[in-house]
């Protein structure tokens, strides 16, 4: 086993958070090596690489790059496309963090003989009875615990999280006070890195260029081999009885719970309740019709079974920065997690993630099946 020394491998994106993380780790006495992953380069821009290299040079730390574009394409982008094409609503950032980014950091650190791994995530870590847990960040507006439900102890015990105890405002001030003005004023990244604005435009572009995705996800497992036409055909909006309401642009361009952007005008508010890929139909209904009191999860991870299973005071979140609900979680005979909600939730969509908390500790999560 590697010695738990003061060496740390830090994921550096070139942005404010990971840059300030590097400064804070250095000031805490760590020997920092920065690694910048090449996951996806929007519009072929490599400015982030130069920013990370320049910062590392100013700080006097070693910096390397790691080309992960091919694995990112197969495990994240093709999964993302696959999920929309089967009528689901994926959350690619949870997959990237749990099954790609943090495991890659761990792998590279092992190869370099480094024990600790770190990022600029706004989360904290605590140890309770020899078990490590992710817990809420000091900055509730930036808290990113929701995305890390799949991490296991081999990763958790190595994590350093230098941004968890400060706010984003404090992070910007921290950089400015040390003469890193460019770092201090960098804009926050928004949305999914490979389609930060509109996923529909990305899907259209992708399907034209890559109309037969070969899905290859390590975890969670998905079925592969579907062949889709580069043309997504228009289909029918229907009510819960199956009666025609209007035409839509193609089922992948809608998500459960959606109200805006339907392109129709009715005398009542309607929401997407269900997506039927095999019929190219999108079912519309009232908001109340979208309420559910239970759900099933696959590909789940539990940090501590005794703390999570069977308790009535578990908090579940199914969206980043969205409402919380109390629930009771059990494991079914066919190895799904059954989540019994204490109050109804609306717009629970297959493919989304759910994360569980108790006493501020992230206890695990999974992917919603239904």
From Swiss-Prot:
<dbReference type="GO" id="GO:0103016">
    <property type="term" value="F:tRNA-uridine 2-sulfurtransferase activity"/>
</dbReference>
<feature type="active site" description="Nucleophile">
    <location>
        <position position="96"/>
    </location>
</feature>
<feature type="region of interest" description="Interaction with tRNA">
    <location>
        <begin position="319"/>
        <end position="320"/>
    </location>
</feature>
<dbReference type="Pfam" id="PF03054">
    <property type="entry name" value="tRNA_Me_trans"/>
</dbReference>
<comment type="function">
    <text>Catalyzes the 2-thiolation of uridine at the wobble position (U34) of tRNA, leading to the formation of s(2)U34.</text>
</comment>
<feature type="binding site">
    <location>
        <position position="120"/>
    </location>
    <ligand>
        <name>ATP</name>
    </ligand>
</feature>
<dbReference type="InterPro" id="IPR046885">
    <property type="entry name" value="MnmA-like_C"/>
</dbReference>
<feature type="region of interest" description="Interaction with tRNA">
    <location>
        <begin position="142"/>
        <end position="144"/>
    </location>
</feature>
<keyword id="KW-0808">Transferase</keyword>
<feature type="active site" description="Cysteine persulfide intermediate">
    <location>
        <position position="193"/>
    </location>
</feature>
<feature type="disulfide bond" description="Alternate">
    <location>
        <begin position="96"/>
        <end position="193"/>
    </location>
</feature>
<protein>
    <recommendedName>
        <fullName>tRNA-specific 2-thiouridylase MnmA 2</fullName>
        <ecNumber>2.8.1.13</ecNumber>
    </recommendedName>
</protein>
<feature type="binding site">
    <location>
        <begin position="11"/>
        <end position="18"/>
    </location>
    <ligand>
        <name>ATP</name>
    </ligand>
</feature>
<dbReference type="InterPro" id="IPR014729">
    <property type="entry name" value="Rossmann-like_a/b/a_fold"/>
</dbReference>
<dbReference type="Pfam" id="PF20259">
    <property type="entry name" value="tRNA_Me_trans_M"/>
</dbReference>
<dbReference type="GO" id="GO:0002143">
    <property type="term" value="P:tRNA wobble position uridine thiolation"/>
</dbReference>
<dbReference type="Pfam" id="PF20258">
    <property type="entry name" value="tRNA_Me_trans_C"/>
</dbReference>
<dbReference type="InterPro" id="IPR004506">
    <property type="entry name" value="MnmA-like"/>
</dbReference>
<feature type="site" description="Interaction with tRNA">
    <location>
        <position position="121"/>
    </location>
</feature>
<feature type="binding site">
    <location>
        <position position="37"/>
    </location>
    <ligand>
        <name>ATP</name>
    </ligand>
</feature>
<keyword id="KW-0963">Cytoplasm</keyword>
<dbReference type="GO" id="GO:0005737">
    <property type="term" value="C:cytoplasm"/>
</dbReference>
<dbReference type="GO" id="GO:0000049">
    <property type="term" value="F:tRNA binding"/>
</dbReference>
<keyword id="KW-0694">RNA-binding</keyword>
<keyword id="KW-0819">tRNA processing</keyword>
<feature type="site" description="Interaction with tRNA">
    <location>
        <position position="352"/>
    </location>
</feature>
<dbReference type="InterPro" id="IPR001763">
    <property type="entry name" value="Rhodanese-like_dom"/>
</dbReference>
<dbReference type="GO" id="GO:0005524">
    <property type="term" value="F:ATP binding"/>
</dbReference>
<comment type="similarity">
    <text>Belongs to the MnmA/TRMU family.</text>
</comment>
<keyword id="KW-0820">tRNA-binding</keyword>
<keyword id="KW-0067">ATP-binding</keyword>
<keyword id="KW-1015">Disulfide bond</keyword>
<dbReference type="InterPro" id="IPR023382">
    <property type="entry name" value="MnmA-like_central_sf"/>
</dbReference>
<keyword id="KW-0547">Nucleotide-binding</keyword>
<dbReference type="InterPro" id="IPR046884">
    <property type="entry name" value="MnmA-like_central"/>
</dbReference>
